Amino acid sequence: MSLPPDAKPNFATLPSAASLADPLASPLPDRLTGLPPVVSEHTVVLILGSFPGAASLRAGQYYAHPQNQFWKILQALWPQHPVPPAGGPDAYPARCAWLLARGLGVWDVYASCERAGSLDTSIRHAVVNDFARLHGRCPQLAAVAHNGGESFRHAGAVLRSLYPPLPPPPKPLAHDAAGLAGRARDDVPGQPEPTVSGAPTVVATRLPSTSPANASWSFDRKLTAWAALMAQHGLM
């Protein structure tokens, strides 16, 4: 799938040249704040991690750790479209534009947390992102792809936040009950209400984590799972 070249990244700030040169140089605060979403109106699959690792927070970039296989897997999925190489002040915006042009988006489940190191098991006092912010910004969204188990734990809450359930239809007033008998013969009581026009159907899927901590899955096995989801939603 190839999207219009004018699809632009949606993120707040770019990392400084100093942080790009040495992402391990700056200390991190006790309370960590995540990165803004990278999405567009063309996003079909939203990839949700748990929370950026230390290297990603210092660089201000998603999946900046060189051993994370995220970008490597995406390149293997679309070999005909080279991923812009890492490094340099323009590399990350170019990578975000590349990702959006594939119909993807990226964000994390947690907006902030306390964590020593980069492991999900060390996350404490986490605050979940406000996914209602994406309602209306991603009209083509069809799937939320959870990059790992910690993210997938919140799959139900994410979907409910994205698209809250509609309230039940009001019951007929007592004085209107007699009017039910006068309805057309094909208006059968007890039939389900029609679906709301334009109401999206978004599914949640757990994908194997691209983190280097997920060493039990080979690269090829991860790639197969990721490819199946992208093909299912017409992105390959």
Residue ranges and their predicted role:
Residues 2-37, 41, 65-66, 119-132, ...:
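C-terminal capping/extension of enzyme domains
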Residues 40-50:
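Short, hydrophobic/glycine-enriched beta-strand segments
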Residues 46, 54-57:
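Conserved active-site segments centered on acidic
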Residues 52-55, 68-69, 111-114, 149-153, ...:
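Short, solvent-exposed loop/turn segments at secondary-structure junctions
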Residues 74, 154-155:
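Hydrophobic packing residues within well-ordered alpha-helices of enzyme cores
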Residues 101-153:
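Internal catalytic-core helix/loop-beta-alpha segment
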